[in-house]
């Protein structure tokens, strides 16, 4: 009788949060946190972590060793790929040298090739409305630096660039209806999916919603080129005509520049037959962000067999506009440019860092948490997504430090290749849990709601052993709730789990999807995969894929709160009698 009573008591505790354990998690995370120390080393010491680069490999090894030093088991690097070529910036300078000296706020795009040495060259501005107008520049570009696109007016800022969700916005997220299966929410930019049922109120400010850009050829602001894909056509012409480099203006302002990867020149086409432009920010050679993706459309710049391209540089919008206006007045500009980069072809594979807290009676079952460790290169990857990595590491550190004994194994995974197309998590999911034959892990995915991904599904050995995956990848903002990804069965469970943290501002339960980050890789094959709702702060306006993605833009108290809540969700998931319920399979 005593054994039965104890078993019943343990079962009850496994279904509802244990207040004493929640209090211990909170105390450890708020009063003994290491999250900012972890993030500072990752972003300040290791720095930017482009997929395939030596810096990312160093981050893989440092996180593996750090997790081991905290007492986690089976810490390792798991390879995926082949990815392609690594790249790093060794030396760069850029300034207008005539008719006057103007030091430029600028950054080369990733995977840009080197120049043969420092050069000073005349500047040619190409500001046209359609591809047919490019013909007049033939014979004028050899040995020149090309400015791609004209002046873009900038608006003053009359609203705060840093915001938190208001009570009204959280309520709207809570009351929204579920989306049709397979339809992605707005991208992971700042909470662009909305939801149903809310709890704790927010703090003042206006939260923006945003869609994350894709991986390639970015720099110009959306809408800079209308009609045919003039940016690609300009690059093609510059390449064919023997130009030295191509520069464009950033979509940012106030000296903030948003920089991603260089573009591969498109195949030469008749200007009158030019294809329509892809959505701004879409990756060169990768599928657009939508529900069911077609295969990639040709080589990406990081592919070992990618066609040659020109050095490509993004300049701050204010300075780019000034140069365009000077040329409009008839000034003859020269730019002095020096660019030395390095490619790494020896190891085409990329790596995820993985470590575990072993479970007890249900040790064969898994609860996962993670964030992507790769970043773009102009900042140090602090908010995208060093913050999510540091929070995931801190969450498992908290549980390990408290010597809690989870029933299920808790596994932390720190991904690579997210910025290029969720490649690290998608390959991991395919290797361990399953995949759709018609949607291989090399194809990029964007929106949420992945259960509509094409079948049939081939299940891996651990498909039925994983309870859930939790992700954080919307910058530095604290957790305000969680996206349920259309899984109505988890709403009440998550609502109970958030109650102990209502005073910390977390309480919104949203049925809607959000996409464009690594939880989608799990959700796409029917595994419960969740992204937390985060306050926007400056993510869309200032730090996301920019040179301002640095440690100083991070809010330490927000990350402490996020790590506490993430640790609590991991513990509660690990202690339940049953795994978290899954959404019905398509066709059920």
For each of these PLM feature ranges, what is it?
Residues 1-11:
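Bacterial N-terminal signal peptides
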Residues 16-18, 40, 44-184:
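Noncatalytic luminal/extracellular "stalk/propeptide" segments of secretory-pathway proteins
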Residues 17-53, 374-375, 471-477, 540-546:
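N-terminal capping segment at the start of a domain
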Residues 19-21, 106, 110-135, 280-382, ...:
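Soluble metallo-hydrolase cores and metallopeptidase-like ectodomains found primarily
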Residues 37, 45, 397-423, 439, ...:
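Short helix-loop-beta-strand segments that form the rim/entrance of peptidase-like active sites
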Residues 99-103, 116, 121, 139, ...:
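Metal-dependent peptidase/peptidase-like ectodomains
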Residues 173-228, 262-300, 439-457:
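Disordered, low-complexity segments in secreted/periplasmic proteins that are enriched in proline
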Residues 304, 397, 401, 539-588:
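His/Asp/Glu-rich mid-to-C-terminal helical/loop segments that flank catalytic regions of hydrolases
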């Amino acid at each position: 009788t005593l054994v039965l009573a104890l078993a019943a008591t343990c079962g009850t505790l496994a279904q509802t949060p244990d207040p004493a354990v929640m209090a211990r998690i909170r105390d450890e995370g708020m009063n003994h946190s290491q999250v900012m120390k972890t993030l500072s080393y990752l972003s300040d010491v290791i720095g930017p972590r482009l997929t395939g680069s030596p810096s990312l490999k160093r981050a893989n090894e440092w996180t593996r060793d750090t997790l081991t030093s905290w007492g986690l088991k089976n810490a390792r690097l798991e390879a995926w790929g082949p990815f392609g070529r690594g790249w790093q910036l060794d030396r760069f300078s850029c300034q207008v040298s005539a008719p006057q000296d103007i030091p430029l706020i600028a950054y080369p795009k990733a995977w840009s090739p080197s120049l043969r040495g420092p050069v000073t060259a005349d500047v040619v501005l190409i500001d046209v409305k359609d591809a047919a107008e490019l013909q007049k520049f033939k014979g004028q570009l050899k040995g020149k630096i090309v400015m791609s696109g004209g002046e873009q007016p900038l608006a003053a800022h009359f609203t705060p660039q840093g915001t938190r969700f208001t009570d009204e916005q959280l309520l709207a997220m809570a009351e929204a209806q579920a989306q049709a299966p397979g339809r992605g929410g707005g991208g992971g930019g700042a909470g662009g999916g909305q939801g149903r049922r809310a709890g704790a109120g927010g703090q003042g400010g206006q939260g923006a919603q945003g869609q994350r850009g894709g991986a390639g050829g970015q720099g110009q602001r959306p809408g800079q080129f209308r009609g045919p894909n003039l940016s690609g056509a300009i690059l093609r012409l510059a390449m064919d005509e023997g130009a030295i480099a191509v520069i464009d203006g950033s979509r940012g302002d106030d000296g903030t520049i948003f920089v991603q990867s260089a573009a591969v020149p498109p195949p030469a086409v008749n200007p009158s037959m030019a294809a329509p432009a892809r959505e701004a920010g879409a990756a060169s050679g990768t599928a657009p962000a939508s529900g069911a993706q077609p295969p990639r459309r040709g080589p990406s710049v990081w592919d070992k067999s990618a066609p040659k391209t020109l050095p490509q540089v993004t300049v701050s919008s204010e300075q780019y506009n000034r140069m365009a206006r000077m040329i409009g007045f008839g000034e003859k500009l020269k730019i002095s440019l020096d660019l030395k980069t390095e490619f790494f072809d020896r190891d085409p594979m990329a790596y995820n860092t993985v470590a575990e807290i072993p479970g007890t009676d249900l040790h064969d079952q898994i609860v996962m948490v993670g964030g992507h460790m790769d970043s773009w290169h102009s900042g140090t990857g602090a908010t995208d997504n060093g913050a999510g990595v540091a929070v995931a590491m801190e969450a498992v550190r908290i549980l390990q430090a408290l010597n809690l004994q989870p029933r299920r194994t808790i596994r932390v995974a720190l991904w690579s290749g997210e910025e290029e197309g969720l490649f690290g998590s998608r390959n991991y999911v395919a290797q361990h849990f399953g995949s759709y034959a018609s949607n291989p892990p090399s194809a990029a995915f964007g929106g949420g709601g992945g259960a509509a991904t094409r079948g049939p599904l081939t299940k891996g050995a651990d498909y039925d052993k994983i309870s859930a995956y939790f992700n954080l990848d919307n910058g530095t903002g604290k957790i305000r709730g969680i996206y349920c990804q259309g899984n109505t069965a988890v709403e009440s469970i998550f609502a109970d789990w958030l109650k102990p943290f209502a005073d910390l501002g977390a309480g919104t339960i949203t049925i809607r999807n959000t996409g464009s980050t690594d939880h989608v890789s799990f959700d796409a094959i029917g595994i419960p995969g969740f992204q937390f709702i985060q306050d926007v702060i400056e993510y869309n306006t200032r730090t996301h894929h920019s040179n301002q993605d640095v440690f100083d833009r991070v809010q330490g108290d927000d990350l402490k709160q996020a790590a506490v809540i993430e640790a609590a969700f991991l513990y509660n998931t690990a202690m339940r009698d049953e795994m978290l319920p899954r959404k019905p399979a398509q066709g059920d």
